[in-house]
């Protein structure tokens, strides 16, 4: 099984070819092909290589499937005995990527 651990949009993701993942909003168009170069670890059928912190000459190719919004997060703040209440909500903008290939 081939997989990689990459760093993208401030988080680390375990990615495998043929699967899609949701990243924080990226400034790309749907249908574009992009290369993710911050690869921290790669497993090529049992042969594990770890970077310090990143691997050189290794990249993950992905296709942008589209943009979407995450689930609504509700934030509720209140101060007891003061009648101060504040309710807010937001939805995070996401970009869905299909992992095509891991090139090492």
Curated annotation (Swiss-Prot):
Pfam families: Ribosomal_L21p. The keyword Protein transport does not apply. It is found in: Plastid, Chloroplast. GO terms for molecular function: rRNA binding; structural constituent of ribosome. Coiled coil: none annotated. It comes from the Eukaryota. Disulfide bonds: none annotated. Its main location: plastid. One of its GO terms (cellular component) is mitochondrial large ribosomal subunit. Keywords: Chloroplast, Plastid, Ribonucleoprotein, Ribosomal protein, RNA-binding, rRNA-binding. GO terms for biological process: translation. HAMAP family: Ribosomal_bL21 (MF_01363). This protein binds to 23S rRNA. Part of the 50S ribosomal subunit. Belongs to the bacterial ribosomal protein bL21 family. This is Large ribosomal subunit protein bL21c. The gene is rpl21.
């Amino acid at each position: 099984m081939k997989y990689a651990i990459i760093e993208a949009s401030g988080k680390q993701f375990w990615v495998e070819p043929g699967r899609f993942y949701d990243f924080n909003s990226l400034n790309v168009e749907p249908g574009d092909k992009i290369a993710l170069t911050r690869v921290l670890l790669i497993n090529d059928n049992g042969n594990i290589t770890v970077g310090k912190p990143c691997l050189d000459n290794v990249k993950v190719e992905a296709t942008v499937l589209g943009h979407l919004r995450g689930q609504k997060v509700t934030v509720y703040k209140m101060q007891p005995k003061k009648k101060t209440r504040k309710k807010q909500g937001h939805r995070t903008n996401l970009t869905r990527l299909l992992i095509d290939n891991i090139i090492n």
